[in-house]
Amino acid sequence: MAHELDVSPSDRERPGSPPVVAPRSVDLARWCASRGWPVHPLAPGRKTPTANCERCRQPGHTHKGCACIQAGRWCHGFHAATLDFARIEQWWFNHPGLGVGVACGPAHLVVIDIDAHRQQPPDRDRLLPGIPIPRSVDLGGLANGFHTLGVLAALRGAVSPADDETTLRVRTPSGGLHVWYRAHGSHRWQCSAGSSSTRALAWQVDVRANGGYIVAPGTTTVAGTYTAVGPAREPAALPDWLARELARTGHLPPRASPT
């Protein structure tokens, strides 16, 4: 499988790059786990977790203390994510059609999920929460998360994460981009949706962190394959300016702040 994973034969136990062609899911899951990223199955051909068993679907049942997770089953999505290679082999060898998800929180990852959906932009005060955009600024042509994130980065004198070649970036089948970063120390960054009125980094820019998961590069759905782009194949440290913006927009629990 070395040629499929774009690694040398001597590096098979810890592949050095995510797949450049669609690999077997078990190899992809092992590649992620070898980096300390807990993995969990996604439904075949989809980007959502596999369904719970009948008992775990009952109202009021949660992942806390769930016997299924304790027994090594995959109920409750990213809550069942594991680094156990024996469990990984069992899950994906027996069910090779499953996709691979990565639990962001325990993996200490913050992933900037940039969307490119065709939508009418909201009022300018919703484009960059907490940052007023004067009426004198022409927003003609602004159409998606690539644009709003680019504006935010420009205001801070920084490179947009979409153009950050120092870190792992993954093109999504819908034309979006997942930009992977390593979280700072013990900070527990929180998830958000770019459309949220309570916590958001920018319009059409989601944040995947604690309490969420991300589709692993190399995973294939009915819509296409999540493909790593650019030279980097590992997440870089979360840039300081971006950490400050995440803190400013409420992505840390109360009484926590970045150093």
Can you say where each PLM-predicted feature lies in the sequence?
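Conserved phosphate/metal-binding and DNA-contacting active-site motifs used
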Residues: 2-258
